[in-house]
Amino acid sequence: MESLAQLPGIFLPLAGCVLALSLSALLAVGPIVRVTPTEVDICDLPAVREIHRVRGGYLKSEWYKSLTPPGVTSLLTLIEPTQYSEWRRLLAGPLSDTSLGKVEPMVTNHVHATIDRIASDLQSQGVSDLYKWWTYMATDVVSELSFGEPIGLLARPKETAWVMDYLDKVGIMHAWRTTFPFVFVLGRFMPVHPFKHAIQAIGLLGKWARRSIQQYRQHIQEQPESPKPTLFTKLFKADKFDDFQLTYLAGSYITAGSHTTAVTLLYLIYAICRDNEIRQKLLAEIRTLPENFRHDELRHLPYLNQVITETLRKYAVVSSALPRVVPAGGATLAGYYLPGGTTVSTQAYTLHRNEAIFPNPEKYKPNPKYSYLSMLSVWLIECRFDPSRWESPTQEMKDAYMPFGGASRMCIGNSLALMEIRLTTTLFLRRFPEVQMSRQNGMRDEDLAQEQYLIMAPRGHRLLVEA
């Protein structure tokens, strides 16, 4: 598009540090930068408000369709607003705050079981890997909510370890699927495939999901008046989706609702380990709770929620580009006219580091021992973590805060994620108030450097702690 030639451009490699490079460019040249001949990145709050405004006309780009196999649709990849609204009406009810209150005991039981596993590790090994256990917990929670029974990662970690083969690679795998789709097409004919174990795990997950769906259908037939509630009970009764579509839909819930929650919890505990003042203030607030508190009480703890909000600002798991398409007729965004059909991408990574909106968002200290790309990748480790900024947030801060996506397509599972994060943080710190990051087995801060693909993960895929 000829009119985009006037915009400054950058080259973005597939290296897990794309967002740091994009941030560097936006800081250097202004609020808009061209990343491909037909796509721009924007870090301009008025433009972000317009792009993500409900019924604003900026539809998701065709890129989203490349996230799923041919013939498969998920809530994430739906483009047409009417169809999306219909799906959301069917799916949103069980994920409302009211409905989640009914499953709180189940979620709490999984949290307690996870903390017991961590305690067992600490007693027998002296360290425990929170990345592993938070992922196991979140996966069991969302799988039980989806299918009526958990996959069983907490109860049978060795037998179900294949799930981690998939979740560990999901971010980079989707980056390759969307950028080099031929790798997946030709992969079945190649003796060596970069995602062999992850693809095998997808097959096992599908097999487990199909069996669980069949069992739940049988359960509904046996107890039609009072079946065990799941996220998809309404869909079973409405008979709007076949088993193939239900399998993929539930699988997408597991992908979206496990790794994201686990990584957020990991970085929250990591941030607490790095700042004793934050730890002590949070512990003092938690100690005011009764012994058998409920989640609703946690919703009203100001400092706990400030810590969670700041974690989601600094360590937003889905902080990569959210591509939308400029409507026919074009639009002027960030001072530039963009023709209709141009892809415009916003991303939480740069918005959450906009100093005009979030004062002092960084405290980066270059280290000469790191290479250029490594410095970009570890940049976020030194980003300033300040929960107090959320005591009286400005409207600009609220509008720029996008850990769950833009207003028009907000993540449907954000209430569930926040419930898990609040319950887990509180119960874990009650059990282990003096938790510290371990230095055993070569554990270091650089293991927590963020790898940014479709979703973010710590580079070392671990957080070893002692308590």
Curated annotation (Swiss-Prot):
Binding site for heme: 411
Conditions for induction: Expression is under the control of the azaphilone cluster-specific transcription factor azaR.
EC number: 1.-.-.-
Keywords, ordered alphabetically: Heme, Iron, Metal-binding, Monooxygenase, Oxidoreductase, Signal
GO molecular-function term, one example from the UniProt record: iron ion binding
Signal sequence range: 1-28
Keyword Membrane attached: no
InterPro entries with a match to the protein in the record: Cyt_P450, Cyt_P450_E_grp-IV, Cyt_P450_sf, Cytochrome_P450_monoxygenase
Needed cofactors: heme
Pathway the protein acts in: Secondary metabolite biosynthesis
Top-rank lineage group of the source organism: Eukaryota
Family membership: Belongs to the cytochrome P450 family.
Biological function: Cytochrome P450 monooxygenase; part of the gene cluster that mediates the biosynthesis of azaphilones, a class of fungal metabolites characterized by a highly oxygenated pyrano-quinone bicyclic core and exhibiting a broad range of bioactivities. In the first step, the non-reducing polyketide synthase azaA forms the hexaketide precursor from successive condensations of five malonyl-CoA units, presumably with a simple acetyl-CoA starter unit.
UniProt cross-references to PANTHER family, sorted A to Z: CYTOCHROME P450, CYTOCHROME P450 MONOOXYGENASE STCB-RELATED
Protein's name in the database: Cytochrome P450 monooxygenase azaI
